[in-house]
Each structure stands twice: as structure tokens, then as C-alpha cells.
Amino acid sequence: MEITLFDPIDAHLHVREGVLLKAVLKYSSEPFSAAVIMPNLSKPLIDTQITLEYEGEILKNSSNFKPLMSLYFNDGLTLEELQHAKHQGIKFLKLYPKGMTTNAQNGTSDLLGEKTLEILEDAQKLGFILCIHAEQAGFCLDKEFLCHSVLETFAHSFPKLKIIIEHLSDWRSIALIEKHDNLYATLTLHHISMTLDDLLGGSLNPHCFCKPLIKTQKDQERLLSLALKAHPKISFGSDSAPHVISKKHSANIPAGIFSAPILLPALCELFEKHNALENLQAFISDNAKKIYTLDNLPSKKVRLSKKPFIVPTHTLCLNEKIAILREGETLSWNIQEIA
């Protein structure tokens, strides 16, 4: 059995920087045609110049791959800066509520504040797409749900602004997407295939710790259903977020799952299991092209066959190891050719 996927797109990706970028980028740039690149670096991408420099680093270390750059939402985004960014081909803004995830200490503290709404008004006029880490302070399993009132306000106040709920994790958010024409979402492999049991049902597994948290079986099943039918308002976004093992095994574990090396084989396995392989092309590419109005992307064909793929236990960054999701397991699908 074989399947060929055309122009895979990862609508939410972390490729880090420096030597770590050089170690992990290939796992995304080789099989994927394009990816929406997250801006929460140690030095966040708060303006056009910094963002273009980072884009250059990605392009220097990849080929036949389009990084779709995003700006870190901040109070310094004047109308002039947004116009400059748009002129340079940047079409995404990423809003992080302050402190909700990795490198979000510079995030937005008042999501409904006057300055935030002013920037969103400008973004709407210029045709930006707003990607939001949709969590609010509260009990860890309810943080996405607690952000619903903010999402509703944004959707009503800016009806022409496309708003993406990144890494949808709570089944209660599905109703919002179906209610509001301008609300969309991305789904990760881990949120549609894993639950809290994978994180802490046995021994604590730090390599399954992410934000937003993987949640209950009900959440996983409802989200998987969206993916399997390739809901037209949903696109795939891996949120692949590598950390070296020494940090993942520390007392202060950073959130992030490194899934990039297994994404396409694991998705094939999952969709075949549920008799939905015919919908994988839409989930992995076609929906994103429509939602984000993407064209002129690098052409890519990825042929996968039903042959065993043993997931490596790790990859290397200098002398440090980076653990890979489902390390050591055997997947039933494997990439045979990328053209």
C-alpha cells in the first residue's frame, strides 16, 4: 500500500536557532513544502528586521522549503511597522498571553486592552492572520476554555480578521470554530493521538509534556474526529518543539514535544487505522492552502509506503541528545521518496 502527499504544510513549527536549528530543521524542511515559523525565540521576533534575519538563517540551512514567518505580537507593532512587515511578505502575527508557554514572558498581559485592540484593528485592515496561543491563567486543564471569552470578543470585534486557535486541545473549543466564520484552528499529532495517560499515567514522561497540555480521552477523540474528516476550518500544525534531553530531564522541564521526524509516517498510520487515508491530503496541505491563501509554494511530492519505520531514540545537537516522540517504536508507514 502506498500514498503520495503533495506539498505538505506544517502550520505551526518551532525550528529554534543556532546549532539547534541546524540539527532539527532538516526533519521539517525535507518532507514539508512550507511551515508557519513561530517567533518565540530567546530573542523574540518583535519587528520586521529581526524576523527577516531569522528567515535568512532558515533559508541558508534548507532548500526547496518556504518558511512562513510570523511576528511576535507586542506593543511596539505600530501601523508603520505592520505595513513594513506586510510589504516584506510577512502575513502572520502570533499572540502569546504573558507567561503561558515557552518564551512567553514578553507576551501580552492585557488581551483586551486598548493597545492590543488597536493593533488588531490595524492587522485586520492590512490583511494579517492572527495566530493565538489560546490559554488564560487558571486550572491547567481549563486554560483554553477560560480563553473563550477573549476569542469571542476578537471574533465579534474583528470580523474580517482570520483568527487561528493554535494547537486546539479542548473539545469545548470546537463549538467556537463552528460558530464564528473567522475562527479557525490547527491540530497537532500529539493532541489527536495522545492523552494525559501518556504523560503521567505510568512513570512521568517529560518528552510528552507540552503546552497546552494533552488532555482527556474525550478531548483526544473529538479532536481526532476533526482531523480524520479534514474539517475545512482545520489545518495541521505540528507544534514540534525540540529541547535537548538535559533540559527535559531537569527539575524545571520546558514544554515541547519533538515530533518532526515522525509526522508523516505517524499520520499515515493514524489515518489508515481509522479508514480515512483519503482525507489526509486535505488535512496536511489543501486546507492550509485555502485558509492561509498560500500559493507559489515549493512543489513537493512525498511517497510513503506501508513498510516498517523504527523511530530513532534521539538525534544529536553537538554533544547533546534530543529525544524524538515515540522513540524506539515501530511505525507501520515509512517515507520512500521525496521529489
Curated annotation (Swiss-Prot):
Catalyzes the reversible cyclization of carbamoyl aspartate to dihydroorotate. NCBIfam families: pyrC_dimer (TIGR00856). The gene is pyrC. One of its GO terms (biological process) is 'de novo' UMP biosynthetic process. It comes from Helicobacter acinonychis (strain Sheeba). Its EC number is 3.5.2.3. The lineage of its organism: Bacteria, Pseudomonadati, Campylobacterota, Epsilonproteobacteria, Campylobacterales. The modification N6-carboxylysine is found at K94. Pathway: Pyrimidine metabolism; UMP biosynthesis via de novo pathway; (S)-dihydroorotate from bicarbonate: step 3/3. This is Dihydroorotase. Zn(2+) 2 binds at K94, H133, H167. Substrate binds at H14, V15, R16, N40, H133, H243, A255.
